[in-house]
């Protein structure tokens, strides 16, 4: 590989300690490089643990290393050493882990050490500084390099963090692929819960031809103290805090349990007045505008954190910030803390030792237990970390009754012991002790063939078909499984040929090159991340772009290829059943018949028959679809069609504790619209719908959208973090206009249904000075010459909305033409919109000015 020229301004090298230490020439011995890196460690006043020292020495001897040491034992420093050696020798290195937030965190840390010009990042959506000497990415990005380039992959050093994800059912294949193809690389595999790594030692040595060394240790920088208690959670927490063992992370295995625990703890006082004042100071400027925001704010001001995937990202970030300041005594969260959640913890309290794993409730695995408990104890802050396990609730209750009986035989006889709930998977102190010493289970191969994998391999300049067969042959699978993978690969290949995404190059045109050619007509960032994307491309061609419902039908297809957000769909079905039950009661149907009919109901599935029928046809012709299935649903579509804001939808379905779930689904729909739907399929109405969705995301929690846009900007460079500011929802005119139009139709909808009171309520303070009687009189005047106000797709077409900014462009005059069945379209509603207020509140604020015949403005 040619020598890499280091970029960056030399005047600022002193700001980046490892960039400053890079030798002028790449012709430098390992001993010299090691000495330079040890100088860096000395400057940071760090002292290497034996395992760290051993691993670094082995890496500088050009060996592969499998590093299995506990959480907090400095594995990141070993990875940094590998990056330094690689860059000093003019090569490229790549760091990968499973979580985008961790990739971002590592990216920022490496930028500080090596300078931002020398570090890139990729998380699956887009990339920043892709060709930098150091790249931080998710495992799937590395897997794509490994599939597309094989042993020609541009990275000589490969660091795979959280390597136990190798056994993840869905994503594990991404951790395996580099170990099958990147034969010219050196590997550093990192995990605190590897189990027995001998198999990987042999495989990595076989692949690279270089020795692979296992460096392992059970010695923790901060030792753990374990205890099992039969006291209620509130008593346990009070005792821990009194003993100076905070911050405490209270572990639950469902988001709802974590949220309920935070609510239950509000009756206890964990923080002093001074601490609460400090919390309020840090929270100053934070916006809690979502429906659940008031609850989150209340918990935080009381010194109680909450942390789970159902929260909006901005709230999780705030919780982490407060926790890092040492101001939160208790954090109620889920077991996701085991995967790199940036929350400092002294004590971990396990509320249970069993959890639902998707199919059944079972005792925690050794790996799950060690991942969770390993977060207790903060290196540099704590001398010891604490792990507390709660006994089952019925055991705690029985223990309380026995304590009240105080050995009184009569009371003991009368006592009725509480029984565990039906189907309960219990645990005991013995269970707890066994988990403490248990070795993590062996990592199981999750290799699988997908059309995305096939596309990457077939894009190689040489014989991609042969490379695909070799990939399957070298996989860590059984002989029987390899046979099935070959069959599936053939089915996938035929499907890609049939869809013309892959073409066979005629012999006369090959000229010694590849036998295959990828179709390059799809947009540059065309995404095949979703297994059903090929179906989406097919189905888009079957719907009429001139149909008045074309835009929402496109959205339905996008939603159909995404995973089901179950909590939202359950609430939708519940609402459908409630409405059906009320209607059947009114019709006088017998109870048994009502119950029978309820069982037949399902949540809304627009174009249900079209989607199922076209998908069945697609699956019949393309057996590679395998276990995949289409999932029609209407969440983003329902919001769009019914003019619902994010807050409206949360209230409609009581999703306060699952705001993050709704945000992620909407974000996924937006990404499919933006990245997978071909530009040729995007009519003006689709583009407007896409802008509306972007506006909803930006106004709710801009972090996901900002990351998406930042990563799509090739010129973006990291800077020091600044205090968080509210997102400017007015910066994108198209998005902001779409939000204004949604607010207009939130007013128009009840007005069209002759409910002026509800219409005024929709405007809130923007209806000041107006009365329901005034609206009713104007509506009567309108209806005297028009049948009704239309609310269909034509009525909401953007061409019927007119904007006129004032000279300062801080206030817009907005006119909305009312569309009627006679198509006279001669009335309008006028509003003013204050952009300053919109920026402050994170949503457009409409003031009603006038309703009447169209006139020049």
Task: Describe the residue ranges of each PLM region.
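Helicase-associated low-complexity/disordered flanking segments
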Residues: 1-65, 273-301
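Conserved two-lobed SF2 helicase motor
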Residues: 131-147, 302-316, 322-342
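Conserved interdomain hinge at the start of the Helicase C-terminal
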Residues: 229-253, 260, 317-325
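Non-catalytic terminal extensions of ATP-dependent helicases
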Residues: 305, 324-325, 411, 415-757, ...
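Conserved segment of the helicase C-terminal RecA-like domain
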Residues: 347-350, 354-356, 362-403
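Compact beta-sheet-dominated globular domain cores
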Residues: 819-857
């Amino acid at each position: 590989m040619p020598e890499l020229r280091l970029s960056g301004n030399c005047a600022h090298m002193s700001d980046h300690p490892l960039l400053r230490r890079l030798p002028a020439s790449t012709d430098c011995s390992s001993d010299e490089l090691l000495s330079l890196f040890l100088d860096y460690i000395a400057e940071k006043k760090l002292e290497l643990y034996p395992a760290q020292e051993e691993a670094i020495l082995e890496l500088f001897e050009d060996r592969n290393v499998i590093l299995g040491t506990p959480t907090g034992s400095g594995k990141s420093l070993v990875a940094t050493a590998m990056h330094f050696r690689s860059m000093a020798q003019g090569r490229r290195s790549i760091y990968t882990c499973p979580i985008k937030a961790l990739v971002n965190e590592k990216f920022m840390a490496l930028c500080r050490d090596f300078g931002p010009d020398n570090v890139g990042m990729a998380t699956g959506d887009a990339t920043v500084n892709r060709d930098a000497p150091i790249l931080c990415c998710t495992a799937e990005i590395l897997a794509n390099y490994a599939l597309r380039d094989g042993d020609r992959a541009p990275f000589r050093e490969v660091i795979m963090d959280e390597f136990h994800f190798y056994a993840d059912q869905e994503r594990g294949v991404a951790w395996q692929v580099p170990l099958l193809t990147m034969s010219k690389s050196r590997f550093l595999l990192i995990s605190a819960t590897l189990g027995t790594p001998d198999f990987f030692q042999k495989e990595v040595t076989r692949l690279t031809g270089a020795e692979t060394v296992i460096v392992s240790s059970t010695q923790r920088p901060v030792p753990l103290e374990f205890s099992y208690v039969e006291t209620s959670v509130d008593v346990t927490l009070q005792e821990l805090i009194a003993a100076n063992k905070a911050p405490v992370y209270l572990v639950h295995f469902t988001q709802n349990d974590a949220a309920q625990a935070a609510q239950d703890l509000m009756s206890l006082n964990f923080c002093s007045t001074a601490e609460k004042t400090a919390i309020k100071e840090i929270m100053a400027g934070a916006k809690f505008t979502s429906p659940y925001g008031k609850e989150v704010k209340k918990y935080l001001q009381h010194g109680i954190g909450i942390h789970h995937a159902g929260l909006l990202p901005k709230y999780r970030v705030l919780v982490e910030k407060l926790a890092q300041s040492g101001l939160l005594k208790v954090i109620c969260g889920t077991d996701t803390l085991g995967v790199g959640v940036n929350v400092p913890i002294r004590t971990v309290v396990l509320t249970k030792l069993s959890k639902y794993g998707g199919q059944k409730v079972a005792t925690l695995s050794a790996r799950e237990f060690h991942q969770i408990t390993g977060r207790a104890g903060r290196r540099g802050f704590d001398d010891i970390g604490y792990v507390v396990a709660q006994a089952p609730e019925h055991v705690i209750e029985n223990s309380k009754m026995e304590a009240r009986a105080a050995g009184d035989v009569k009371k003991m006889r009368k006592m009725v012991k509480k029984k565990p709930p039906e189907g309960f998977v219990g645990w005991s102190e013995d269970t707890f002790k066994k988990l403490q010493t248990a070795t993590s289970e062996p990592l199981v191969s999750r290799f699988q063939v997908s059309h995305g994998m096939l596309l990457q391999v077939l894009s190689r300049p040489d014989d991609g078909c042969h490379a695909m067969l070799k990939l399957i042959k070298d996989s860590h699978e059984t002989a029987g499984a390899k046979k099935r993978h070959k069959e599936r690969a053939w089915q996938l290949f035929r499907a890609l040929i049939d869809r013309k995404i892959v073409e066979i190059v005629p012999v006369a045109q090959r000229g010694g090159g590849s036998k295959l050619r990828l179709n390059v007509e799809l947009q540059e960032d065309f995404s095949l991340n979703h297994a059903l994307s090929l179906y989406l491309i097919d189905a888009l061609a079957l719907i009429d772009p001139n149909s008045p419902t074309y835009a929402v039908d496109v959205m339905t297809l996008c939603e159909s290829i995404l995973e089901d957000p179950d909590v939202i769909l359950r609430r939708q079905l519940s609402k459908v059943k409630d409405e059906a039950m009320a209607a059947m009661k009114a019709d006088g149907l017998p109870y048994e018949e009502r119950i029978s009919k309820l069982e037949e109901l399902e949540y809304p599935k627009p174009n249900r028959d079209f989607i199922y029928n076209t998908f069945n046809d697609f699956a019949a012709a393309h057996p590679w679809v395998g276990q995949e299935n289409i999932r029609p649903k209407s969440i983003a579509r329902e919001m769009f069609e019914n003019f619902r804001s994010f807050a409206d939808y949360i209230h409609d379905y009581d999703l306060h504790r699952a705001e993050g779930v709704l945000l992620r689904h909407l974000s996924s729909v937006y990404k499919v619209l933006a990245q997978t739907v071909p530009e040729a399929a995007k009519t003006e109405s689709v583009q407007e719908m896409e802008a509306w969705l972007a506006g909803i995301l930006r106004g709710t929690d801009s972090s996901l959208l900002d990351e998406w846009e930042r990563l799509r900007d090739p010129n973006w460079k990291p800077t020091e973090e600044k205090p968080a500011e509210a997102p400017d929802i007015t910066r994108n005119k198209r998005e902001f206009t779409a939000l204004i139009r949604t607010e207009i139709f939130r007013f128009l909808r009840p007005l069209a249904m002759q409910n002026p009171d509800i219409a005024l309520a929709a405007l809130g303070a923007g209806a000041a000075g107006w009365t329901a009687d005034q609206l009713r009189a104007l509506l009567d005047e309108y209806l005297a010459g028009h049948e009704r106000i239309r609310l269909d797709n034509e009525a909401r077409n953007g061409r019927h909305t007119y904007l006129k900014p004032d000279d300062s462009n801080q206030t817009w005059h907005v006119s909305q033409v009312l569309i009627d069945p006679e198509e006279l379209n001669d009335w309008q509603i006028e509003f003013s919109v204050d952009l300053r207020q919109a920026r402050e509140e994170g949503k457009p604020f409409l003031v009603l000015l006038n309703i009447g015949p169209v006139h020049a403005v």
